């Protein structure tokens, strides 16, 4: 399949674009008429705009049927077309006033704020009509007229002063006249003084009033002189007067209109140049802000987007089928929240239009404009600003942004995970008789799944004249239908899936076998891969349809081809439970059993003796074998002292396999199957596994293993052991009470005493269990349970932890067999409940970790055979022990196994063992150890130089197949699944070493893995030496200071907690990178001080440490794939003469490419420093905006992508799934895509063994003669006697 495009670009829609895409203007807020149930004209569901509600029928019914296709009804204005256009056609709302898009001004960071250099708070004031913004200013006119205007102002001030003087003079003459009159009237002095005082107050008020007016004029003048474009001014008397007096020189407005006018006049190129100069000249915060602003400005320049598009004059109305209205019972309706939000916008918009037409006062109009802005904000992103808009029951309405983001958003709900046809679901039951590649499919389910294929076959073989008849035959359950079903399913694999699908083995292909009943039958050996059991689990069945899909299912996904676990390369289809019991019983030796000491000439003879009842399968006997492998040698014949049971077991193993003459428990069977997988073909291994399974079940049935209460044997000496340790514990308590011990020492002593007591009881208990005890058999063989569980049941419960994770120093002495006291029961359940809560939390945390890992590694696909970079990393194979001998490095099979050698491996005396380019197998590791090789240089994904993905040579073997990884293998996804799948097994706790706050808390388990993959700085991170030198220690009151004096006299100081355990002493000599204190390191510091290789090792080893502590095997290369993704970015330090910006986080390959271009053109190159980014940050910083948007922070990613006109090169898997392309992995790669599979003639003849030339001719014709005799075609078909021939 060839795609029509290679990349996707997202950019801003202009007003013209929206009008061009739209099919009409939505003018009314109405949805449908509740009487007629038809959409209202010009409303949110209008048929004139969005298309008809019925196929090929206009709104009024004048035009019906498809012959009127494309006709627009002159009566109702509806176009005659399919109703499906209501999913595609959009309308628009013409706004009465412009509004700002909330994503651009309320996002973090505010793009509008950076562009216009306005603080978000000030921007908010302008947009929501709380302040004016100056949008244009005639600076030249102001400059020219400034003197005249000032003279005019001075004249006004002079006039005010003259008026003031005149008013005061008038008041004085009035006062003198009044006093004269009062004196003439012989009024008292007090009265005259009162009149004088009042007059003076009046004159003071006059003076104050005129002074205020003058001061006001001065303020108006100062404000006018200080006016600048972009300046913000509150709506007060001063600014109103500035507008009245000097309104000809400037223009100021409020709301989105002000922003729009600023953006229309905004010069991007000029601003970019000014900011470039600022970056060079400025320092500190000004430089940082200039860089951030330039980043936004450059985004607009590169995308050629018009910034004015951030302000909207029209709003798109999405198709009505995407915001449906559904009729419920009792005549009520349920509608999408978007309809309510659109209705609010339309109502406010119509009201604003009416107010503008009426010429309403400005304050009322501004208030309505603000409400319109808020309504549009709620439509685009409800709750981003202010209180979210709520509907009925106080529920927040879902906006357009909410439709995209989150688990139930468009990306994750509909684009990345779709429901599929040809699928079913049922409960699973065990199918012990199935082969490894088979599953049991219920007949009824198969009939429904394969219905179209059965119909086709019935038509092909002329057993039904048409599709309707064929369907009726299937519904009736005609006998011929079952024959057709048998024939159809023969060559068709089905896929079985069990949720949760934590790794690739959660979906496997099987050949279906028809079974009665309604439950799917599952092979017992694949249960481990699916993590399935038969306590009510359900599984889904899917049907691969195309020939390519069937071929892939058969070759890549068939259960018998998926024997190895992709996480560590070990077999996952291991016998367990009953099978182990059976094999253990079969290979047990009982010296006194019947027939012991006899000799037989063959296994057959021994079996005959057993059938006669003369020989037990457990009796030690001598048997003559032919063609047997013993001690690595193949012998023509040999007499082996063994048991008949062991001989029967060895018959299940393939020819040429060494004879297993030992008791077969879980460990032995595991090593046998490991060896089989390494040496034999998959077909042979699958056959052997089936034989072992059958033998195991057969002899498990005959072993008669049962459990009774009498099998639980308690040690008789338990009380004696307990009383001895009780005395010791009492002594410790007394020492504490008289003050000889601290509380911490007491707790530690008691824990130590009771741990020893528990071990002694467990030891005594194991001795009490006889060899033939069934519980003993189960535990010893590895079939079920362990000695710790048996100790709880039969010995003593022992020490338990409280919910904080601390050990309670008083043990539970009773066992479950004896029964717990009330106190013991309470203490026991206290910690146990915490365990259950932890498990629930762990599952969610682990799932989220897997999701982040998948997201960061999803585009790591093998793209080429060899990147050509031959240097690798050195890995140890052996180490020299205290005895001076070489020993194999623990976990070598999880570090060097399956890798490609980067250089020849030679013995110390220069003999060649392995050549560069060879893959390291288990056998090769053994040869390295035998030859005394200490370390080897291997290729690694950490050093791979492939531009996209990784190369096959650097990755090495695929652990799932045991062969070199193929081009197209999605190794990133496999790595993420391998790390994430066992996540639930990891513990949640932060453990305390000692008492609750005695030492530094050590983060372990899942939180530690998250801490490492997110490259977080740990709490109380341990410092590392930044140079070679000597350490001195200074003790303070609360903390210690470590002072490192380097060899070149530099001094470094580190402050550490008083309780931290030091790794150095005063005067110790340290080397660069040495850890000075116990605890976790900060990966960023490791990178800074020791370099990239050290941080790679630290992260890989840190993650492995957590998984190994829980006994979870994972190969290093999976962790390396994730670490490679974490180290892909660099931070630009000096941008030189390139288009990069200082402080910019950029992909390493892109950085090198831009530097090469600069070098070729003779420009100054940039310099950068390596960064270690956490997986979340790395996922969001990916080249693909589609992948990042579907991961997290959808609105932020989309906003940035739109502004910068981001192009998605469609390299990763997620982005191709989203747009419906084949994924660029496996057979989806162009290398394999052009292959056209066709069935061979022999395959067709095998599918249709009874097809004859007459049928071929009949099928090629266009029509069938009604007189044609179909019975002639059924001659020779094997049909049941009672089958009616039509």
UniProtKB/Swiss-Prot annotation:
Binding site for Mg(2+): 533, 535, 537
Any single GO BP term: DNA-templated transcription
Catalytic activity: RNA(n) + a ribonucleoside 5'-triphosphate = RNA(n+1) + diphosphate
Cofactors named for this entry: Mg(2+); Zn(2+)
Binding site for Zn(2+) 1: 58, 60, 73, 76
Keyword Nucleotidyltransferase attributed: yes
Pfam annotation, one family: RNA_pol_Rpb1_2
GO molecular function: DNA binding; DNA-directed RNA polymerase activity; magnesium ion binding; zinc ion binding
One Gene Ontology cellular component: DNA-directed RNA polymerase complex
Residues reported in the UniProt entry to bind Zn(2+) 2: 867, 944, 951, 954
Cofactor binding, note field: Binds 1 Mg(2+) ion per subunit.
Record keywords: DNA-directed RNA polymerase, Magnesium, Metal-binding, Nucleotidyltransferase, Transcription, Transferase, Zinc
EC numbers for this chain: 2.7.7.6
Family statement: Belongs to the RNA polymerase beta' chain family.
HAMAP family assigned: RNApol_bact_RpoC
Functional note: DNA-dependent RNA polymerase catalyzes the transcription of DNA into RNA using the four ribonucleoside triphosphates as substrates.
Subunit structure, interactors included: The RNAP catalytic core consists of 2 alpha, 1 beta, 1 beta' and 1 omega subunit. When a sigma factor is associated with the core the holoenzyme is formed, which can initiate transcription.
Name by which UniProt lists this protein: DNA-directed RNA polymerase subunit beta'
Native source organism of the sequence: Tropheryma whipplei (strain TW08/27) (Whipple's bacillus)
Organism ancestry: Bacteria, Bacillati, Actinomycetota, Actinomycetes, Micrococcales
